[in-house]
């Protein structure tokens, strides 16, 4: 029983830490997306190029 209890607390702390990290990641991603959206609206001519570059960068990072 003690052994099970220990593993349970361990997994719980791990999940908590993971969740916190994920939240910050999502927040930064959302902010970045908002910025890119604004930039896209302004520059219509360079839309394809900027989009391609941004998607490539995002895929590599995340």
Swiss-Prot record:
Record-level GO BP terms: chromosome condensation; sperm DNA condensation
Gene Ontology molecular function, alphabetical: DNA binding
Region (Disordered): 1-62
Name of protein: Sperm protamine P1
Lineage: Eukaryota, Metazoa, Chordata, Craniata, Vertebrata
Family in the record: Belongs to the protamine P1 family.
Protein purpose: Protamines substitute for histones in the chromatin of sperm during the haploid phase of spermatogenesis. They compact sperm DNA into a highly condensed, stable and inactive complex.
Subcellular localization, as worded in the UniProt entry: Nucleus; Chromosome
GO cellular component, as recorded: nucleosome; nucleus
Protein's organism: Trichosurus vulpecula (Brush-tailed possum)
């Amino acid at each position: 029983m003690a052994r099970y209890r220990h593993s349970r607390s361990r997994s719980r702390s791990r999940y908590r830490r993971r969740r916190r990290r994920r939240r910050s990641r999502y927040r930064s991603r959302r902010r970045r997306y908002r910025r890119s959206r604004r930039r896209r609206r302004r520059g219509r001519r360079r839309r394809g190029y900027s989009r391609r570059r941004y998607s490539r960068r995002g895929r590599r990072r995340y």
